[in-house]
Amino acid sequence: MPQQTITTNNRKSINRGKDIAKDTILTPNFYTTDFEAMEKMDLSINEEELEAICEEFRKDYNRHHFVRNKEFEGAADKLDPETRELFVDFLEGSCTSEFSGFLLYKELSKRIKDKNPLLAECFAHMARDEARHAGFLNKSMNDFGLQLDLGFLTANKDYTYFAPRAIFYATYISEKIGYWRYIAIFRHLEKNPGGKIFPLFNFFENWCQDENRHGDFFDALMKAQPRTVKSLSHKFEIFGYTFKHPIFDYYHRFRYFLNNHPIVSKLWSRFFLLAVFATMYIRDLGTKKDFYGALGLNAREYDQFVINKTNETSARVFPVVLNVYDESFYKRLDKIVENGTLLSAIDKRNNSNLIKVISKLPIFISNGYQLIRLYLLKPLESNDFQPSIR
């Protein structure tokens, strides 16, 4: 799809074609889930903790935090063209990611409010936070004469379906990794103010607390497992067709039995931790490396710190976590990053698409091999890894 850029009053509304044309596994995605299953969730096992977290959400600690000050005036004009481009790219990706969270949480709060009001209220509060973050980022984009077309994104972005259980795993890790990313940048710039290229970073300390509270919510929600659905269904859906028969009840019972088996939980924990960690590492050391350099950060050291801390935090809720301390862990991720450079070089050649695909095939196989070896790396049992916090 060609790039469509609309210019109004010297401001450009971006992403009317860019996001759809350039979607990759590394770009922020939009998600949907099984709303019927979500509204049937039984929270009684951990309702007290969920109610306490909801009360924290109601207090809205950052209600008056995201207020722009005079530091933003003229700050965009002080950046050199290269740093400006890197920072705008960061703003665009971050805003899209926050807006993606808003859409998911908002839709969940609307769909389940009648049958699961506590869960709906928690999602509504988180949607409020994500919308606030996205709006604040979009205002910073305005400083550069740009504005993300959020309405167009809502209508035209492809939505990826995840089952509720997968949403819990992936979103918990994403929220916790967001906390460690923001607090690490804030603390670095606090010690090295020369790297503070824009006043937006002054807000990261309080900002990361929103991410942390969101992660705590999903922690509590997962502790309300394993019996999340109050009643099973006689329906079976495939390829858009719905079949109804009591026999499908046994299928669902077997499926939920498998999903709730401890071994399955361990496999899912490893899968989602690796998926999130690998995606961030490949992106940051590939296309985002220069941005972190502009902040005075070493992208590799920064990512490894964030991954290690998120892995430790995840031991509070997941039965196992990744052995990121094994010497092969980051070596294999680095190999995938190197392969990414080779793939980019192949794309720049003046060869036919067929030749490019053939040239890339061994690299894709190498990436797959590295990821499989990482997944099969013996995990750390959370009870042994961090007994003090469990």
Curated annotation (Swiss-Prot):
Q: Which Pfam families did the record assign?
A: Rubrerythrin (PF02915)
A GO biological process of this protein is: photosynthesis
Signal peptide (from-to): none
Co-factor(s): Fe cation
Reactions performed catalytically: Mg-protoporphyrin IX 13-monomethyl ester + 3 NADPH + 3 O2 + 2 H(+) = 3,8-divinyl protochlorophyllide a + 3 NADP(+) + 5 H2O
According to UniProt, this protein's pathway is: Porphyrin-containing compound metabolism; chlorophyll biosynthesis (light-independent)
Q: A GO molecular-function term, please?
A: iron ion binding
Asked if the record carries the keyword Membrane, the reply is: no
* UniProt EC number: 1.14.13.81
Identify the enzyme class.
oxidoreductase
Q: Any idea which UniProt keywords this protein has?
A: Chlorophyll biosynthesis, Iron, Metal-binding, NADP, Oxidoreductase, Photosynthesis
**Where does the source fall among the domains of life?**
Bacteria
The UniProt function text for this chain reads:
Catalyzes the formation of the isocyclic ring in chlorophyll biosynthesis. Mediates the cyclase reaction, which results in the formation of divinylprotochlorophyllide (Pchlide) characteristic of all chlorophylls from magnesium-protoporphyrin IX 13-monomethyl ester (MgPMME).
Query: What family is this?
Result: Belongs to the AcsF family.
By its UniProt entry, which HAMAP family does this protein fall under?
AcsF (MF_01840)
In its UniProt entry, what is this protein called? Magnesium-protoporphyrin IX monomethyl ester [oxidative] cyclase
Please give the organism.
Prochlorococcus marinus (strain MIT 9515)
Give the source lineage, highest ranks first. Answer: Bacteria, Bacillati, Cyanobacteriota, Cyanophyceae, Synechococcales
This chain is encoded by the gene named acsF
